[in-house]
């Protein structure tokens, strides 16, 4: 799984605030001057930065569905409405589905549930992220769907490798795929999307929260750290809360 980050700009006394406030996202690319060595140094450092692991799903109007593992999920705001963000490297079928439907479901995972890390690992790999269907004209795999698709073409042998058995997947009232045994699901509508270099940053409003079958109190978070899926545990002394 690649580690993904977006640029963050903060105000500075050396620049007028109104310039930063009205700086268009389309201009971000011109500020990319990182050398190859700098990119590698950044990548190595970020491997020591623990990131939350979620699975995001969406769908197209024709009934096709898409999903992937993401490590860029971030809660943005709580009030007046919960808002979250995540980013996806493009090109991506999942990003295309989100842009078409303007909806996404974020599945929170637990290290206490073994199949959650299995889901995340398999959906992070390109060959397992999709259920390939044969394109008879080009004789190649070209369709990327999660189980439950309305597509009726003949599947290739690679579809047998799909990590999500249909019993794991249900549909939301909007028709998006849900992983029924997730720790929790955030049903969201997209409110903003911005292309930042080779990623798209999505900002979404959380319309409803659905708790999974596992008790939250007995579940440990699932994070990605140093190229491995890891559990979380409190340090001693336990910090009850951290708020800026």
Curated annotation (Swiss-Prot):
Which key words tag this protein in UniProt?
Answer: Mitochondrion, Oxidoreductase, Ubiquinone biosynthesis
Following inactivation of the gene, the phenotype reported is:
Strongly decreases cellular coenzyme Q levels. Increases cellular sulfide levels. Decreases coq4 protein level; addition of p-hydroxybenzoic acid restores protein level. Sensitive to hydrogen peroxide, copper(II) sulfate, and mildly sensitive to thermal stress. Decreases growth on minimal medium.
Q: What is its main location?
A: mitochondrion
E.C. number, please?
Answer: 1.5.1.36
Q: Does the record bear Phosphoprotein in its keywords? A: no
Question: Which superkingdom is the protein from?
Answer: Eukaryota
Protein's cellular compartments: Mitochondrion
| Gene Ontology terms: cellular component | mitochondrion
Q: Which GO terms describe its biological process?
A: ubiquinone biosynthetic process
Q: Which InterPro entries match?
A: Flavin_Rdtase-like_dom, NADH-dep_flavin_reductase, Split_barrel_FMN-bd
Alphabetical list of SMART domains matching this protein: Flavin_Reduct
User: What is the protein named?
Assistant: NAD reductase coq12
Taxonomic path: Eukaryota, Fungi, Dikarya, Ascomycota, Taphrinomycotina
